[in-house]
Design a protein with these regions (language model features):
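A short Gly-Trp-Pro
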Residues: 3-142
């Protein structure tokens, strides 16, 4: 797929630094290690490579898996879903539809969410921008 944001892998490597392996090589950060896992403020989550808007804080929930989880993207066109048969299992990879960077995986395992989906994202693949009037909230208030 051709993405609106096009850069050479050398350019990505220079720009992304320690984020490169996750965003461009589909690595996975260690569970419970991401800075955004416990982010409780209202705001917007964007692609850590290109800034494309991906998820609203109101769709974030605690799945207990060790990575930030969301039940839907800001719109269906914000992300690209691809079959991933690595590691001896079939999963659905989630990429940024604007630059093709790897974000994580989506699983249809429910958790009682409105969509029945769990977008399991790498914190290092996301940027968080709090709303101007944002204060910490409980997960049920988001």
């Amino acid at each position: 797929m051709d993405y609106p944001v096009q850069k050479s892998e050398h350019e990505w490597r220079e720009e992304l630094g320690n984020r490169y392996s996750v965003l461009r090589e589909a690595a996975t950060e260690r569970p419970w290690s991401g800075e955004l896992l416990d982010e409780m403020r209202s705001g917007l989550y964007s692609c850590g490579a290109c800034g494309h808007e991906l998820f609203k804080s109101g769709t974030k929930f605690d799945s207990g898996c060790g990575w930030p989880s969301f039940y839907e993207s800001v719109n269906p066109e914000a992300v690209e879903l691809l079959e991933d048969d690595s590691l001896g299992m079939v999963r659905t990879e989630v990429r940024c539809a604007n630059c093709g960077s790897h974000l994580g995986h989506v699983f249809p395992d429910g958790y009682g969410t409105p969509t029945g989906l769990r977008y399991c994202m790498n914190s290092i693949a996301l940027e968080f921008t709090p709303n101007a009037t944002s204060t910490p909230q409980s997960p049920t208030d988001r």
